[in-house]
């Protein structure tokens, strides 16, 4: 399948490398960026931004111009004046380059008549160590030997002459080390420790807030982040920018001063942030401009250097002229920009070796802060913000993955339904039935051109125009199986301009040599919503020429003038899959011209599918039982009452309690007293469908194990469900933590004899390591050496994060930056004195084997109680436990397949119902007695009620009380008799009589409303009462109390009170709670009551449950307009049914 070129960007399937596609876009955009830069430099004040963006898209710079542009971006010769820069040789510390203001900032400039020595105090070749006091140059020397020097920033140093404090921020370049020096504000408490370990505290509250947010809400996540960054930094405006697939950007969240113009929803062209700048954001995650109007300071360097030094990673890099003008145009003087990076998309070329490669990173977006006056943020606070952005990146990763999974699930569901239609009516069915091809991917219209006939949906070109597109495809793209483009104009279709605003983008597939399916998209601008004042008048001398967010928006609209929203890879995969299905189900006319019939793909019968599903379920169940019994991890299970119904060999071995003796005992009787509440919590949560993770329980020991003390287990609770998804029990997959807790208890008792624990040679000792409060490794026990492959001498005195566990080729490599960020959060949380959660932590040992573990960390204290570091344990799950968890997932999938069978049964019930309706229609004209007609009428109402329930596919609308209610005229007594008929089988089986108590006028009462819903709720309440009533307790009474109200002169409202009374004690309280507060783990009866209560609420009514000393009652209050009310007055009657 071919794709047209739009902005030199190819649309391809996910099987192609996402990295390659991104590289292609970078290569395509960079000449445009260079062209814009050259035009700005050449025209300055007369630079017309909006028109230049459009021109740059049509023409690019020469190769030499691009090279000069990139060198200017990465090797600029100026820095901002709020600090000074020194570039040194990494071994001798000889000065290679320095900013002109360095001598003044370091107090090296003479105050009297200068001497030769003073003038040469700072020059190329100077030993930089002589500029600082002894402890400072020692710290700089030590940092220079470190592999990833960035992890040590900032380093507190003091100038030799004045003692003035600076933060030294170091990074490596091709010729040496760059040291950025930023003055420390005297009123700020300087950070005396190196690294991020202290900066974490500044952002701890914001990090905790981000981590507490629920998943699945990207908008909330971004809104909270901009507020937290605003509070941390104090900038006037904080915005979250997101880069879209085609590289253009959008403001998706904003927190600003009330008097500033909003930019929320603004889109801007890809060229607004050049690719070279994006590269710099990947190199230097935080970029601060203190004052865009300040005069930049020149860098002086050694003449022997062949090119200007790279300042990509410098915190002092001066803004380029065009960026400074952009800021000035929008009234901004200072800014702080932080990059948001996420894991790069992986190729779908199979899983082989995928675990052996660390994931790459890509720029997801930016966090941009602006201020209307000069503003300086100290480096520790910027570091804290960077750490916060790393946590945000982890959250974004989750959201991106969840969104992708949700989209794929939607497409798979739609494809399944479309396939079902194709089996009955291919290919027309996917246009004439619901869902249709427009549900497969987001589009504005679709068309099927099949056997010279046309079927259309939504906004499409005319029939003549579609035929012209078909002819164009056959002439110019005959060798491909289809085409996708976001711009028919740029794809070269000659009639694109004539299509107007209806169609800009198109995806087309061939289903035979002459037949096509089309998806159409309209203009991109239709999707754009900007919170700013894009329609406000612009200054007469501006007219969009000035660089400003408003002109960026105008430029963006110009760039996408002839373009639709791009087709995503997952969408093209779905379209291509449908094409394969269609081409397989239809015989191509060219292949067999004599046979124009459709070729139907034969599907296996439903019975065979059910049998196959049962066999699969049985196989999985048998395998799971075998694994549970033989697993080296303790596994136990209970039913909904909390009684043991599963107890594997390992659990019996640890506790000394044989399997046969454990079965049937309440779990709370087998745990020690302080675990009883934990077990009850787990069971209560499981009944609500909530599966608790990583909870600790202590089991009693018996027989030969009785003297060994309790068995301490870390358990994960898994809900066991039946075919109707009802929770029927809880399975506990556990890990024996007894040995670790013995060590922890010993560690707590001895309060400081950490070395005795770590060096204990016992095999029961788990992998243990210790760090100090600066993050350096102090101890590394034998078990850690075995599991990691790193010797103790190679780990001790190294930074845990950056030297021991790293994202580089040395140490124990982790998969991605997110893993290191999570580890850093854990360590910082412990050292700050908080109790952290356990961390699922994975890394590659020195042999390349991937190790998955659960990490526990606890604080270390000295004799005075001061926190001095952390003690950490690793718990590595056995292969059997991992296999058991995998089989559990397979079991859940099998249960889901069974649930699909229930959906099938629901579908098949509709045919017998239709047969019953047909039989009823035949009986209605027959000569029936009055009693027979009443019975037939009740039967009809039962059928209609069942049919309505079968159509309730959208339970959410019922829960939200906006489901549609029917409005028909009905007789109230007929509806009540139908309710009683539904309860009769259960009533006779339990020998419980049902009394009815209502006035005679009810038989004459004709109301207007949804009688079937009324029947449904009353029958459900009545069935629930029968379930919890015993024969000897007395009858159930259905009582109706009507009250009439006249509305005006021609309308009456019947206020009805239905009381369903049964003997005490009545329905269990837990079930009544489920009726009003539904949870995922609700019982079948609770779900029925909950739905009925919501239906009554939808009818503008209420439900109550009243408990009295001798009876309990459901009280339903509803009202209906009166359709016809007999004036005949009847005496009240009480009778049995």
Curated annotation (Swiss-Prot):
GO terms for molecular function: phosphorelay sensor kinase activity; photoreceptor activity; protein homodimerization activity. Phytochromobilin binds at residue 322. The keyword Ribonucleoprotein does not apply. It comes from Oryza sativa subsp. indica. Residues 217-400 form the GAF domain. Belongs to the phytochrome family. CDD domains: HATPase_Phy-like, HisKA, PAS. Residues 1-18 have a biased composition (Low complexity). Transmembrane segments: none annotated. Homodimer. Regulatory photoreceptor which exists in two forms that are reversibly interconvertible by light: the Pr form that absorbs maximally in the red region of the spectrum and the Pfr form that absorbs maximally in the far-red region. Photoconversion of Pr to Pfr induces an array of morphogenic responses, whereas reconversion of Pfr to Pr cancels the induction of those responses. Pfr controls the expression of a number of nuclear genes including those encoding the small subunit of ribulose-bisphosphate carboxylase, chlorophyll A/B binding protein, protochlorophyllide reductase, rRNA, etc. Contains one covalently linked phytochromobilin chromophore. Residues 1-27 are annotated as: Disordered. It comes from the Eukaryota. GO terms for biological process: detection of visible light; red, far-red light phototransduction; regulation of DNA-templated transcription. Residues 904-1124 form the Histidine kinase domain. Keywords: Chromophore, Photoreceptor protein, Receptor, Repeat, Sensory transduction, Transcription, Transcription regulation. Residues 620-690, 750-824 form the PAS domain. The lineage of its organism: Eukaryota, Viridiplantae, Streptophyta, Embryophyta, Tracheophyta. This is Phytochrome C. SMART domains: GAF, HATPase_c, HisKA, PAS.
């Amino acid at each position: 399948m071919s794709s047209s070129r739009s902005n030199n960007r190819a649309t391809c399937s996910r099987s192609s490398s996402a990295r390659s596609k991104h590289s292609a876009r970078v290569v395509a955009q960079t000449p445009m960026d260079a062209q814009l830069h050259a035009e700005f430099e050449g025209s300055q004040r007369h630079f017309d931004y909006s028109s230049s963006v459009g021109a740059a898209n049509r023409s690019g710079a020469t190769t030499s111009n691009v090279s000069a542009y990139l060198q200017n971006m990465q090797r600029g010769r100026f820095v901002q004046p709020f600090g000074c820069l020194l570039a040194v040789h990494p071994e001798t510390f000889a000065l290679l380059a320095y900013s002109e203001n360095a001598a003044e900032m370091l107090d090296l400039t003479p105050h009297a008549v200068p001497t030769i020595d003073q003038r040469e105090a700072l020059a190329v070749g100077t030993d930089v160590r002589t500029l600082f006091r002894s402890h400072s140059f020692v710290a700089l020397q030590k940092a220079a030997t470190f592999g990833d020097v960035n992890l040590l920033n900032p380093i507190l140093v003091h100038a030799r002459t004045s003692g003035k404090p600076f933060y030294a921020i170091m990074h490596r370049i091709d010729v040496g080390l760059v040291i950025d020096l930023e003055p420390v504000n005297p009123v700020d408490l300087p950070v005396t420790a190196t690294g991020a370990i202290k900066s974490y505290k500044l952002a701890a509250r914001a990090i905790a807030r981000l981590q507490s947010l629920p998943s699945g809400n990207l908008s909330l996540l971004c809104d909270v982040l901009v507020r937290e960054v605003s509070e941390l930094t104090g900038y006037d405006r904080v915005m979250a920018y997101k880069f879209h697939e085609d590289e253009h950007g959008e403001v998706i969240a904003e927190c600003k001063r009330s008097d500033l113009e909003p930019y929320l929803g603004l889109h801007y062209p890809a060229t607004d942030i050049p690719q070279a700048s994006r590269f710099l954001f990947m190199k230097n995650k935080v970029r601060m401009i203190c004052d865009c109007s300040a005069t930049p300071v020149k860098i002086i360097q050694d003449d022997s250097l062949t090119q200007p030094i790279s300042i990509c990673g410098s915190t002092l890099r001066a803004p380029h002229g065009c960026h400074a003008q952009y800021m000035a145009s929008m009234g901004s003087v200072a800014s702080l920009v932080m990059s948001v990076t996420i894991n790069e998309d992986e190729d779908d070329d199979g899983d082989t070796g995928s675990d052996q490669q660390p994931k790459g990173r890509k720029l997801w977006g930016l966090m941009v802060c602006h201020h209307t006056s000069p503003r300086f943020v100290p480096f520790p606070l910027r570091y804290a913000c960077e750490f916060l952005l790393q946590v945000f990146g982890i959250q974004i990763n989750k959201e991106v993955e969840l969104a992708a999974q949700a989209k794929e699930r939607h497409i798979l569901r739609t494809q399944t339904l479309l396939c079902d239609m194709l089996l009955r009516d291919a290919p027309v069915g996917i246009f004439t039935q619901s869902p249709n091809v427009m549900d497969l991917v987001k589009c504005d219209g679709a068309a099927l051109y099949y056997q010279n006939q046309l079927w259309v949906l939504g906004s499409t070109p005319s029939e003549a125009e579609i035929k012209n597109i078909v002819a164009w495809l056959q002439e110019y793209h005959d060798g491909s199986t289809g085409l996708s483009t976001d711009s028919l104009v740029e794809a070269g279709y000659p009639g694109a301009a004539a299509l107007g605003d209806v169609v800009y983008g198109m995806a087309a597939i061939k289903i035979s040599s002459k037949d096509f399916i089309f998806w159409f998209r309209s203009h991109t601008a239709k999707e754009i919503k900007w919170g700013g004042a894009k329609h406000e008048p612009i200054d007469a001398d501006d007219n969009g020429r000035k660089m400003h967010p408003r002109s960026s928006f105008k430029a963006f609209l110009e760039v996408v003038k002839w373009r639709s929203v791009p087709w995503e890879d997952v969408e093209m995969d779905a379209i291509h899959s449908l094409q394969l299905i269609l081409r397989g189900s239809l015989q191509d006319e060219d292949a067999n011209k004599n046979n124009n019939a459709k070729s139907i793909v034969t599907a296996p019968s439903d019975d065979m599918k059910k049998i196959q599903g049962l066999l699969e379920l049985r196989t999985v169940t048998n395998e799971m039982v075998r694994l549970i019994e033989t697993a080296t991890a303790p596994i136990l299970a209970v039913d909904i009452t909390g009684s043991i119904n599963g107890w594997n060999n390992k659990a019996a071995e640890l506790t000394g309690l044989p399997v046969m003796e454990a079965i049937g005992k309440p779990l709370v009787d087998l745990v020690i007293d302080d675990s009883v509440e934990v077990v009850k919590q787990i069971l209560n949560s499981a009944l609500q469908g909530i599966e608790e993770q990583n909870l600790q329980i202590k089991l009693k020991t018996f027989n030969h194990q009785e003297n060994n003390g309790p068995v301490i287990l870390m358990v994960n609770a898994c809900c066991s469900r039946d075919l109707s998804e009802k929770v029927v029990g809880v399975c506990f997959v556990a890990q024996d933590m007894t040995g670790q807790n013995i060590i922890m208890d010993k560690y707590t008792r001895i309060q400081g004899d950490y070395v005795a624990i770590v060096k204990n040679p016992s095999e029961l000792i788990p992998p243990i390591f210790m760090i100090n409060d600066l993050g350096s490794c102090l101890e590394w026990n034998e078990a850690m050496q075995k599991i990691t492959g790193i010797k103790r001498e190679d780990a001790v005195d190294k930074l845990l994060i950056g030297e021991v566990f790293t994202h580089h080729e040395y140490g124990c490599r982790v998969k991605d930056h997110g893993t290191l960020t999570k580890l850093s959060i854990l360590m910082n949380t412990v050292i700050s004195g908080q109790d952290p959660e356990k961390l699922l932590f994975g890394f590659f040992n020195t042999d390349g084997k991937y190790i998955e573990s659960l990490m526990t960390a606890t604080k270390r204290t000295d004799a005075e109680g001061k926190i001095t570091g952390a003690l950490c344990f690793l718990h590595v799950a056995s292969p059997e436990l991992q296999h058991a968890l995998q089989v559990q997932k397979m079991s859940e999938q099998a249960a889901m397949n069974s649930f699909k069978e229930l959906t099938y049964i629901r579908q098949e019930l509709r045919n017998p119902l239709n047969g019953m309706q047909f039989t009823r229609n035949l009986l209605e004209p027959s000569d029936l007695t009055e009693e027979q007609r009443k019975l037939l009428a009740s039967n009809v109402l039962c059928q209609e009620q069942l049919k309505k329930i079968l159509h309730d596919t959208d339970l959410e609308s019922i829960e939200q009380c906006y489901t549609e209610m029917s409005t028909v005229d009905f007789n109230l007594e007929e509806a009540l008799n139908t309710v009683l008929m539904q309860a009769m089988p259960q009533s006779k089986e339990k020998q419980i009589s049902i009394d009815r108590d209502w006035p005679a006028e009810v038989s004459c009462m004709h109301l207007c409303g949804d009688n079937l819903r009324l029947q449904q709720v009353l029958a459900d309440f009545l069935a629930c009462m029968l379930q919890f009533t015993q024969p000897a307790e007395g009858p159930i009474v259905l009582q109706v109390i009507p009250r009439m109200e006249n509305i005006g002169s021609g309308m009456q409202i019947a206020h009805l009170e239905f009381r369903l009374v049964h003997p005490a004690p009545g329905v269990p309280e837990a079930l009544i709670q489920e009726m009003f507060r539904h949870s995922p783990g609700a019982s079948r009866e609770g779900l029925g009551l909950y739905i009925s209560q919501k239906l009554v609420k939808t009818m503008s009514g209420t439900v109550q449950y009243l408990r009295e000393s001798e009876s309990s009652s459901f009280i339903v209050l509803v009202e209906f307009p009166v359709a016809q009310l007999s004036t005949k007055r009847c005496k009240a009657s009480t009778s049995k049914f």
